[in-house]
């Protein structure tokens, strides 16, 4: 043990305080090397097949952590000394990032507690600087580590300090001290991305040092210190919340939604407007900020006018009501991430020096300001999407400083645009690693998978129950199956059987860690990125017909007439599904149509077996009755039926799209959805009963009443009244808001109700009161996700909780409340990212479809539209043919208004607009008036507004104030999914052909073994109903 004493003089003539510091040293500190024969081999170990170990010093770890995050860099030893320097000098954000890297088993790096090892640690000498001591201590630890491993493997210490290299490089044989650049060039010559990132970061650090020396005048006020911000929030002087920038007016409008964490009550009941970039004070979209309210005389209103772009200041809403307005005084937590950007044109590039260029790149996301980076590749990458990161934003700079990371691809290329969407949503879709795939079981003709004898304690349903599944056509990822039978007592027994994913994915394995990181399967318009390897998601965890499978089941015994539940059983089972039915086939059987017996191969034997046929028909019919009764109970409690559009993508070979299959509403859809909701509800009750402080549930809070305002106004225009005081009142009033002459009215009202909904989210029960558990949309007191463990990590956690609750699984690996709440936050973020990714990919395909078409001559660019919103200078439209929502201007940039002739044709001419609650009136100079009313049908022309920097966008132009009547050779207006299928199919085929012609077929990367283990491309109707609370229809409007 080392013991040091210091005498601290608190005041010049005050008393002295003696401080004693004890430092304990041990011989048995675990080294973490797989080559070591003496230390324990538990926990994370460095790989055995390494050629060397690399040890970064403090400065490398602080400045180049991003480079060390490359998974290709292996054998990294992080010394405790360097780790603590990051914590003390780089703050909590980077320290947490380092800790995540050390915990991640996918990265070959460990933490060595060198300051507790007796021979590795060196005490600081009198008068020695902290940096010199840290370097000396880390080098001594490298020497000890080399000798501890019996000199089997060399150790390389990397540093940027040339004096350190001169001092230590030749001191110990096989312990090398080199610069980071030399290390990357020598040991990893093929890892070009790491070297480029290193050079970019180095140049950024150099530029930052130059700026600090120059000391330019301040462009923004300094942020207040954290202790002042916290005190101000507690006293009520400042408010805290997350900054949300309006993407349509990114230079003008940002809003801070209060989190209600202040110490005193506030009468602010709405968002706080941050008007302009100066009051935003270097805060970026997503940052947690502290805001000071301005005086009421300085408050402004939210602009409700349509605008041409994010900097259009001419579009002003004179009727806007003022709202609380403030300015940012400090940043509580940054939300910086990777950003996709594009270089400006050559003539706009500012060159500084001979070897580097300081360039303002334009982010893909409108809400992010320009970022200044230093790079030598600006001209070479003119037409490419690149990834950049923000490093700092000093008060002396108009723009944040960042660095170049990597190239995604050429602008406009389909794969590059898809990669852009993934990066913008922080989605990583690397192939599953060898370590993860090595954990997978085998199921080949040579080595078929079989039920293990040790699984004999499972309830075997293979000979006692008629089990069947009902899924979309072609579905191969069957994660749920059903059974229903009559018991000798006269009661009914209903079973929901879910794939037992947790049997194949134990906690903290490589596969489990990867699934936790992804959190969900990501669905794009033309592809899917799985949460689990295909051998599980499409084979061994898929409840296919005629094969044995492990399941986790919920089985109810219920009254045969009232369907009241008498008792319930939970546990692990073995099942063999007898039939794999599609929704359409099940619907035909329920309706008494036996044609599937001739068309479906697996149903052919039933023609000769009337007994088994009768059993199946009875089961399908009875299942529908039970589901209907269950739904009626939820309806009486206020369950909502909202509106959405669902499409299932069918992929063919070479990553092309064959079709998008429309999902026609069937009674069987509701039947299966209701059975899954019932299972989720009962599992939620069970796990909360057993683990009230750390059960994973899903809540859906009521929407804020102001969000329903536009819905109420639209309904009022057609004579309907929408009551939003409760979910029951909302559901009843939506049911009554039917216009027999136009069914789209009710559809649009339900879509608007969907958009007004709050986000459903996962949570740990120990962090909320029981009153907050309620699921507003489903009208259930407790709810969770249990039925889709193949594609949702939350379901895997719930399976582990349930199995532990019924003593069929281990209890020692369950997460406590704090860890579970942190996991829930991660899953919620990933789910939102998945939804945004899906919407943005749909936007991409819509734009690519219309981009090469002449809007003046191509009839596919002409569509019927319905007005569902009124703005100061235009209207909001819904196109049922394509499922698109967008804006159309009634006043252009020249001040002309859109007037109509007697034949309905529209043209621009001088005039004025008057906005009323249910219409907008156009008055020309000739005193002629025309009205555009809510729910009016008009004819629009669709064209694409291209952008070099940002995503392309759909633009709508009203050409007639009457419905579009020419429907020849066009898809049915009542079937927008069919039109979307043609849209995505054509865009993908065009993109693939162009890519083959320009870049060669090697650029295409079809998923291996896709046909062997194909997973369904879309989500079931049940999944859609589950997620409608979070996801509204795509909005491409400028509103």
Swiss-Prot record:
Which SMART domains does the annotation name?
A: RNB (SM00955)
Q: What is its main location?
A: cytoplasm
The CSD2 domain is annotated at 359-425
Q: What subcellular locations does the record give? A: Cytoplasm
Mention one GO molecular function: exoribonuclease II activity
Reactions it catalyzes: Exonucleolytic cleavage in the 3'- to 5'-direction to yield nucleoside 5'-phosphates
Keywords assigned by UniProt? Cytoplasm, Exonuclease, Exosome, Hydrolase, Magnesium, Nuclease, RNA-binding
InterPro entries recorded for this chain? Dis3_CSD2 (IPR041505), NA-bd_OB-fold (IPR012340), RNase_II/R (IPR001900), RNase_II/R_CS (IPR022966), RNR_Ribonuclease (IPR050180), Rrp44_CSD1 (IPR033771)
Q: Describe, as the record does, how this protein assembles with itself and its partners.
A: Component of the RNA exosome complex.
Q: What does this protein do?
A: Catalytic component of the RNA exosome complex which has 3'->5' exoribonuclease activity and participates in a multitude of cellular RNA processing and degradation events.
The name this protein carries in UniProt is: DIS3-like exonuclease 1
């Amino acid at each position: 043990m080392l013991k040091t004493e210091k005498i601290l003089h608190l005041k010049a003539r005050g008393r002295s305080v003696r401080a004693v510091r004890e430092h304990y040293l041990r011989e048995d500190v675990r080294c973490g090397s797989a080559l070591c024969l003496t230390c324990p081999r538990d926990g994370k170990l460095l790989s055995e097949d390494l050629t060397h170990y690399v040890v970064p010093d403090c400065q490398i770890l602080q400045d180049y952590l991003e480079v060390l995050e490359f998974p290709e860099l292996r054998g990294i030893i992080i010394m405790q000394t360097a780790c603590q320097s990051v914590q003390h000098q780089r703050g909590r954000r980077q320290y947490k990032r380092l800790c995540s890297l050390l915990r991640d088993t996918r990265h070959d790096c460990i933490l060595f507690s060198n300051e507790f090892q007796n021979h590795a640690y060196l005490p600081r000498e009198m008068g020695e600087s902290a940096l010199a001591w840290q370097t000396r201590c880390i080098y001594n630890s490298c020497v000890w580590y080399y000798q501890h491993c019996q000199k089997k493997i060399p150790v390389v210490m990397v540093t940027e300090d040339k004096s350190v290299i001169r001092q230590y490089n030749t001191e110990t044989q096989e312990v090398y001290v080199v610069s980071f650049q030399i290390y990357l060039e020598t040991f990893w010559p093929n890892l070009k991305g790491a070297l480029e990132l290193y050079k970019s970061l180095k140049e950024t650090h150099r530029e930052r040092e130059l700026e600090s020396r120059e000391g330019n005048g301040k462009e923004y006020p300094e942020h207040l210190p954290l202790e002042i911000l916290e005190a101000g929030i507690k006293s009520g002087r400042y408010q805290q919340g997350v900054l949300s920038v309006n993407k349509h007016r990114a230079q003008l409008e940002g809003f801070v939604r209060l989190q209600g964490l202040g110490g005193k009550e506030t009468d602010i009941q709405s968002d706080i407007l941050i008007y302009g970039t100066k009051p935003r004070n270097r805060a970026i979209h997503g940052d947690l900020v502290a805001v000071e309210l301005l005086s009421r005389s300085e408050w402004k209103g939210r602009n409700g006018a349509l605008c041409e772009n994010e900097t259009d200041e001419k579009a002003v809403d004179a009727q806007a009501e003022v709202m609380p307005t403030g300015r940012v005084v400090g940043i509580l937590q940054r939300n910086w991430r990777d950003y996709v950007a594009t270089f400006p044109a050559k003539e706009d590039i500012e060159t500084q020096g001979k070897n580097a260029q300081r360039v303002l790149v334009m982010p893909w996301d409108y809400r992010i300001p320009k970022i200044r980076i230093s790079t030598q590749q600006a001209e070479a990458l003119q037409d490419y999407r690149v990834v950049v990161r923000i490093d700092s934003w000093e008060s002396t700079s108009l723009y944040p400083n960042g660095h170049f990371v990597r190239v995604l691809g050429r602008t406009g290329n389909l794969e590059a645009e898809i990669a852009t969407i993934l990066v913008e949503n922080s989605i990583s879709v690397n192939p599953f690693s060898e370590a993860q795939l090595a954990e997978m079981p085998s199921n080949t003709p040579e080595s078929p998978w079989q039920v293990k004898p040790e699984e004999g304690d499972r309830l075997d349903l293979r000979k006692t129950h008629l089990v069947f599944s009902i899924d979309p056509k072609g579905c191969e990822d069957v994660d749920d199956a059903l059974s229903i039978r009559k018991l000798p007592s006269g009661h009914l027994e209903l079973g929901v059987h879910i794939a037992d994913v947790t049997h194949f994915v134990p906690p903290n394995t490589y596969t489990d860690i990867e699934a936790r990181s992804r959190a969900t399967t990501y669905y794009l318009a033309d592809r899917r990125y799985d949460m689990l390897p295909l051998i599980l998601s499409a084979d061994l965890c898929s409840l296919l017909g005629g094969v044995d499978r492990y399941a986790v089941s919920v089985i109810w015994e219920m009254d045969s007439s009232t369907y009241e539940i008498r008792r319930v059983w939970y546990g692990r089972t073995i099942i063999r599904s007898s039939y794999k039915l599609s929704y359409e086939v099940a619907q035909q059987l329920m309706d008494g149509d036996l044609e599937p017996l001739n068309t479906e191969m697996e149903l052919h034997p039933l023609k000769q077996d009337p007994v088994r046929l009768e059993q199946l028909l009875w089961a399908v019919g009875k299942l529908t009755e039970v589901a209907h009764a269950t739904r009626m109970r939820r309806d009486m409690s206020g369950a909502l039926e909202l509106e959405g559009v669902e499409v299932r993508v069918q992929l063919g070979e070479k990553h092309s799209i064959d079709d998008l299959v429309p999902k026609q509403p069937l009674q069987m859809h509701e039947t299966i959805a209701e059975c899954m909701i019932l299972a989720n509800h009962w599992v939620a009750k069970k796990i909360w009963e057993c683990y009230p402080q750390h059960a994973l549930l899903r809540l859906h809070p009521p929407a804020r009443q102001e969000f329903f305002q536009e819905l109420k106004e639209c309904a009022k225009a057609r004579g309907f009244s929408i009551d939003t005081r409760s979910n029951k009142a909302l559901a009843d009033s939506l049911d009554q808001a039917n216009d027999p002459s136009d069914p789209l009215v009710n559809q649009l009202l339900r879509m608007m109700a969907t958009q007004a909904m709050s986000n459903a989210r996962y949570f740990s029960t120990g962090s909320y009161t029981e009153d907050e558990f309620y699921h507003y949309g489903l009208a259930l007191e407790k709810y969770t996700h249990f039925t889709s463990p193949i594609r949702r990590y939350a379901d895997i956690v719930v399976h582990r909780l349930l199995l532990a609750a019924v003593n069929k699984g281990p209890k020692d690996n369950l997460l406590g409340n704090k860890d579970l709440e942190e996991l829930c936050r991660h899953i919620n973020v990933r789910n939102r990212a998945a939804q945004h990714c899906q919407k943005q990919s749909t936007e991409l395909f819509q734009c690519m479809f219309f981009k090469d078409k002449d809007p003046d001559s191509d009839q596919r660019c002409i569509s019927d539209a319905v007005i569902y919103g009124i703005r100061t200078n235009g209207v909001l439209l819904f196109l049922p043919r394509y499922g698109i929502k967008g804006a159309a201007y009634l006043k252009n940039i020249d001040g002309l208004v859109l007037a109509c002739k007697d034949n309905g044709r529209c043209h621009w001419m001088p005039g004025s607009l008057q906005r009323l609650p249910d219409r907008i009136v156009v008055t020309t100079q000739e005193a002629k008036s025309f009205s555009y009313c809510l729910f009016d049908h008009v004819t629009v022309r669709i064209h694409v507004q291209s952008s070099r920097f940002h995503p392309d966008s759909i633009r709508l132009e009203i050409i007639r104030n009457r419905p579009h009547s020419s429907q020849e050779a066009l898809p049915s207006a009542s079937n927008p999914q069919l039109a979307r299928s043609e849209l995505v199919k054509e865009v993908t085929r065009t993109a693939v052909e162009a890519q083959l012609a320009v870049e060669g077929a090697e650029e295409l990367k079809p998923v291996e073994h896709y046909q062997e283990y194909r997973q369904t491309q879309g989500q079931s109707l049940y999944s859609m109903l589950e997620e409608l609370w979070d996801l509204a229809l795509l909005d491409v409007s400028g509103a």
